[in-house]
């Protein structure tokens, strides 16, 4: 009888916890003080909060870039232009041009998205619990709360980058799974730079 009561208590705890996880995953994206769309020339490369003008951003970004960075979308696997891109340089946020990742930490994880085992500086990204569910299966999340993912955003403009997982290589054991649509590459040697090639794709899907 006691075991049965404990089981019911655990079930109720999980159910009531889910709305809190959803609220946590949304609260920062609704903050208007974290938005930016102005030209890169007016910005330095520090993680200072900036304001995003959504209308100007729609004009500057492609539909896929906008959906990924502003609506937390996800490009289809193996379609991003940086998935198999290994030139030496730095990957910046496509929205505010802050340096986020280095080619030195990029590796082929086989997941279909650009993968890095570290960021240039921990202060340049923010991490958030992501309770969004591929396919909308909330019962799956209730049964397996450990599947709640960790979302990665740009600390300066709050743009969605992707997610980070604990299955990467040493020494960090991290896998920053990043959308190509959320970043742009700056070559260490512009003279040897070649444009990345992207596979044509439809609209992003909310799955990563």
Swiss-Prot record:
What organism is listed for this UniProt entry? Drosophila melanogaster
Q: What is the effect of changing residue 111 to S?
A: Thioredoxin-dependent activity reduced, but no change in DTT-dependent activity
Q: What is this protein called?
A: Methionine-R-sulfoxide reductase B1
Q: Enumerate the residue ranges of region (Disordered).
A: 27-48, 189-208
Tell me yes or no: is DNA-binding among this UniProt entry's keywords: no
Q: What is the effect of changing residue 177 to K/S?
A: Loss of activity
Top-level EC class: oxidoreductase
Name the cystine pairs. Answer: 111-177
Q: Which GO terms describe its molecular function?
A: peptide-methionine (R)-S-oxide reductase activity; zinc ion binding
Q: Write down the InterPro entries for this protein, in alphabetical order.
A: Met_Sox_Rdtase_MsrB, Met_Sox_Rdtase_MsrB_dom, Mss4-like_sf
Q: Do you know which SUPFAM superfamilies this protein is assigned to?
A: Mss4-like
Q: Which residues form the MsrB domain?
A: 54-188
GO terms classed as biological process: actin filament organization; actin filament polymerization; axon guidance; chaeta morphogenesis; protein repair; response to oxidative stress
Which EC number applies?
1.8.4.12
Residue numbers binding Zn(2+): 93, 96, 154, 157
Q: In which tissues is it expressed?
A: Present in the embryonic nervous system (brain and cord) in neuronal cell bodies, along axons. Also present in embryonic muscles in motor axons. Localizes to growing bristle tips where it is distributed in small puntae. Present at and at sites of actin localization.
Q: Alphabetically list the UniProt keywords.
A: Cytoplasm, Cytoskeleton, Disulfide bond, Metal-binding, Nucleus, Oxidoreductase, Zinc
Query: Can you say where in the cell this protein is located?
Result: Cytoplasm; Nucleus; Cytoplasm, Cytoskeleton
Q: Indicate whether Zinc appears among the record's keywords.
A: yes
């Amino acid at each position: 009888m006691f075991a049965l009561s404990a089981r019911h208590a655990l079930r109720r705890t999980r159910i009531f916890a889910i709305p809190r996880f959803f609220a946590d995953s949304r609260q920062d994206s609704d903050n208007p003080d974290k938005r930016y769309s102005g030209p890169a020339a007016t910005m330095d490369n520090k993680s200072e909060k900036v304001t995003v003008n959504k209308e100007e951003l729609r004009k500057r970004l492609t539909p896929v870039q906008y959906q990924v960075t502003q609506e937390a979308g996800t490009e289809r696997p193996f379609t991003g232009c940086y998935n198999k891109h290994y030139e030496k340089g730095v990957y910046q946020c496509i929205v505010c041009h802050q340096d986020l990742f280095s080619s030195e930490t990029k590796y082929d994880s086989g997941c279909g998205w650009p993968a890095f085992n570290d960021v240039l500086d921990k202060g340049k990204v923010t991490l958030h619990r992501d309770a969004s569910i591929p396919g909308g299966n909330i019962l799956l999340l209730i049964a397996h709360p450990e599947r709640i993912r960790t979302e990665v955003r740009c600390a300066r403009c709050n743009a969605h980058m992707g997610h980070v997982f604990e299955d990467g290589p040493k020494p960090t054991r991290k896998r920053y799974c990043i959308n190509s649509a959320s970043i742009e590459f700056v070559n260490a040697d512009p003279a040897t730079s070649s444009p990345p090639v992207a596979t044509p794709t439809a609209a992003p899907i909310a799955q990563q």
